[in-house]
A protein has these predicted regions:
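A Rossmann-like FAD-binding core segment of flavoenzymes
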Residues: 40-41, 158, 194-201, 205-224, ...
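FAD-site-proximal beta/loop scaffold in flavoenzymes
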Residues: 92, 252-275, 347-349, 354-430
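Mid-to-C-terminal Rossmann-like scaffold of FAD/NAD(P)H-dependent oxidoreductases
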Residues: 133-137, 404-500
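Rossmann-like dinucleotide-binding cores of NAD(P)H-dependent redox enzymes
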Residues: 169, 175-192, 266, 277, ...
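Beta1-alpha1 glycine-rich phosphate/pyrophosphate-binding loop at the start
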Residues: 131-205, 244, 291-315, 504
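N-terminal pre-ligand scaffold of iron-sulfur
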Residues: 1-74, 109-121
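C-terminal catalytic lobe of FAD-dependent flavoproteins
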Residues: 57, 354-380, 453-517
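Glycine-rich dinucleotide-binding loop and its adjacent helix/turn
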Residues: 239-297
C-alpha cells in the first residue's frame, strides 16, 4: 500500500458502513471518545463526541488507509491503529506522522436530539506564527526532510523552501523498499512519498541528486555539489544514515547489495529474477524483512547472523525466538552465532566452515549516521549531530532530525539517536514548528513497525537494556504483548495483533512518570 497520499488510490473504510450521518444519529447513541463509523455521500466518516462537542472527520488514514474508527482518541486527536498517525478532530490536520495529508472534516449540527454532519469544511491548520526565517533549506530528502517541508507549508509559511536530496526521484517511502516493493506486492508508483508536481504545487523547490558539500554557519549558506550556493534563514540537517559494509573479501562483487535506496531495491529485484539462492548477512530488521520478501519471490534464503537469537538485543528472547520460528515456517534457513568469511561468485563461506550457495547477497548489518557535513561545518557531533530538546544544533538557525540527530529523551533522560522512519518524520514536523516559533520540546515516544510475512510487530518506547520482560498473551497465536522494564519502570512495549493496546501503551509512556501494566 502506498504512502503517497496525493497520487495513490488508498483503500478506505466501508463507505456504506454505519448510519447516513447527513440523516443524523441520536446524540445519546454517541459514547464519549468512542468513534462512530458512518458515511456521507459515499465517504466513510467518523463522529466523535467530547462532552457536548461533536467532531466529524474522514474515517480513512491518509498513510496506508487504516480504519480510524478503530483508533484511539487522545484529547482532540485520533490515532490510527496501524502506524500511529495522528489527526486533529477539529480540522482533520495530520498532526503526527506517518500521515502527511489531512483527512476531510465536516460541519456538525444539533437538531434537538439528533446530530447531523453536513458539508465538508475547509481544512486549515494555520495558526499565528512567531518570527519566521527568511528562507528554509532542508538538506536531505528522506523522511525528516520531506515531513518538514510539508509541515512548513501546512502551517502557513510562505517563504522559500528548498529540499536538497542525494538521489532521484526525491523522497520515497523507504520502509516499503524492504517490504512490499521488494516482495513484488507494491508497484513502483507507490514508492514516491510526493511527486515533483506536488512540490511545485506547494512551491517547494526539490533539488534531487545534488547533495550539499559545505555549510558556512557564519554566512548562513550551503554549497551544493554542483557549485550552487543557497542562502538560508533556517537550515535542517536531515542527512540520514549510511548502510555499513563488511571488511571481508568479496564484498565488492556485483551480486552483493546494500539496501537503502530505491535504486538498491530495484537492483536486488533484478538480480533476484536471475538466481535461485540468496544469502542475507545480518539478522536485523531490514535483513529479516528482505529475507521474507525474497522468499515471497520464490528464492531459497539463508540468513547469517552473529547472534544466537534474531533480534534478541531489541525484542528479547521469547519474541526473538518467535520471529525465528515464523521465518523457518516460511522456509528461511538460519546460520546463527556465525559470520561470513569470504563472499565468492556463487557462494558465501562462513567462519564455521560452512559454505552456502548464493547468487545474491544482501547486507543488513546496520547503518552509520552521515555526520561528515555537520563535522566540517563545526557543529557538535557525538554519535550523531547533538541537538537540544527543540532539535536545535550548536549553530544558530541550524536544526537536525532523523537518523543523524542525537536528542535528549524526556522519558528516559538519555540522549538517543533513533533509526526509525516515523520518529524521523515526526522530528521533521517538530523542526518545522520550531522554525516558525510555534513548537515546543520534542517529546514523542519512539515507534516502529516491522512486517514479517502476515505478522506485524508494533513497538513503542526505547529499551536499550532491561532487567525484566513480561509476556502477556500467545505469540504463536499472534495475539500478544511484550513489556520491557528496568528497575520497575516500563521502557517499551511490543505488540502483535493488539493495535489499540499499542496506541494506549504509547500514550502511557508519554504521560505517566512510571507507566505500569
Amino acid at each position: 500500500m502506498a504512502a503517497n497520499q496525493d497520487t495513490t488510490q488508498l483503500p478506505s473504510s466501508d463507505p456504506k458502513a454505519g448510519p447516513d450521518l447527513k440523516a443524523g444519529v441520536d446524540f445519546d447513541s454517541l459514547a464519549e471518545n468512542s468513534p462512530l463509523l458512518g458515511h456521507i455521500d459515499g465517504e466513510a466518516v467518523i463522529l466523535v463526541r467530547q462532552g457536548q462537542q461533536i467532531f466529524a472527520i474522514g474515517a480513512t488514514c491518509t498513510h496506508y488507509g487504516g480504519p480510524l474508527a478503530e483508533g484511539l482518541v487522545v484529547g482532540e486527536t485520533i490515532h490510527c491503529p496501524w502506524h500511529h498517525a495522528r489527526f486533529n478532530l477539529r480540522t482533520g490536520e495530520a498532526e503526527g506522522a506517518p500521515a502527511l495529508s489531512p483527512v476531510s472534516c465536516f460541519t456538525v449540527q444539533r437538531e434537538g436530539s439528533k446530530v447531523k454532519a453536513g458539508k465538508k469544511c475547509e481544512t486549515n491548520a494555520r495558526v499565528p506564527l512567531g518570527r519566521t526565517p527568511a528562507s528554509v533549506v532542508i538538506i536531505g530528502a528522506g523522511a525528516a526532510g520531506a515531513a518538514c517541508a510539508d509541515m512548513l507549508r501546512a502551517k502557513g509559511y510562505e517563504g522559500p523552501v528548498t529540499l536538497v536530496g542525494n538521489e532521484e526521484p526525491g523522497p520515497v517511502d523507504r520502509p516499503n523498499l524492504s517490504k512490499d516493493y521488494l516482495a513484488g506486492n507494491a508497484p513502483e508508483e507507490w514508492i514516491p512519498l510526493r511527486t515533483r508536481e506536488y512540490y511545485e504545487s506547494i512551491h517547494v523547490e526539490l533539488v534531487p541528486n545534488d547533495p550539499a558539500g559545505h555549510i558556512d554557519t557564519a554566512k548562513r549558506t550551503t554549497t551544493l555539489r554542483s557549485g550552487r550556493v543557497l542562502n538560508y534563514g533556517a537550515l535542517l540537517l536531515a542527512t540520514g544514515a549510511e548502510p555499513r559494509s563488511l571488511a571481508i573479501e568479496g564484498v565488492e562483487l556485483s551480486h552483493v547489495f546494500k539496501l537503502r535506496t530505491l535504486a538498491d531495491s530495484k537492483a536486488i529485484i533484478a538480480r533476484a529474477g536471475q538466481v535461485k539462492h540468496a544469502v542475507v548477512i545480518g539478522a536485523s530488521f531490514i535483513g529479516l524483512e528482505a529475507a521474507a520478501s525474497l522468499r515471497h519471490r520464490g528464492l531459497e534464503v539463508t540468513v547469517v547472523g552473529q547472534e544466537k537469537i534474531p533480534l534478541e538485543h531489541v525484542l528479547g528472547k521469547e519474541l526473538g525466538e518467535f520471529v525465528r520460528r515464523l521465518h523457518e515456517q516460511n522456509g528461511v534457513r538460519f546460520c546463527l552465532a556465525d559470520s561470513p568469511r569470504i563472499i565468492r561468485e556463487s557462494r558465501v563461506e562462513l567462519s564455521s566452515g560452512q559454505s552456502i550457495g548464493a547468487g545474491l547477497v544482501v547486507l543488513g548489518v546496520g547503518v552509520t549516521p552521515r555526520t561528515a557535513l555537520a563535522e566540517s561545518a563545526g557543529l557538535t557531533v557525538d554519535n550523531g549531530v547533538v541537538v537540544d530538546e527543540n532539535l536545535r544544533a550548536s549553530a544558530p538557525g541550524v536544526y537536525a532530525a532523523g537518523d543523524v540527530a542525537r536528542y535528549p529523551d524526556p522519558i528516559s533522560g538519555d540522549r538517543l539517536r533513533i533509526e526509525h522512519w516515523v520518529v524521523a518524520e515526526r522530528q521533521g514536523q517538530a523542526v518545522a514548528r520550531a522554525m516558525l516559533g510555534i513548537g515546543g520540546p520534542f517529546r514523542d515516544v519512539p515507534f516502529f513497525w516491522s512486517q514479517h510475512y502476515d505478522v506485524a510487530i508494533n513497538y513503542v518506547g526505547h529499551a536499550p537494556s532491561w532487567d525484566a520482560v513480561e509476556l502477556q498473551g500467545d505469540l504463536d497465536g499472534r495475539n500478544a504483548t511484550v513489556i520491557y522494564r528496568r528497575k520497575g519502570r516500563t521502557l517499551a512495549v511490543a505488540t502483535i495483533g493488539r493495535d489499540r493496546e499499542s496506541l494506549a501503551a504509547e500514550e502511557r509512556l508519554l504521560t505517566e512518570p512510571r507507566p505500569t501494566y
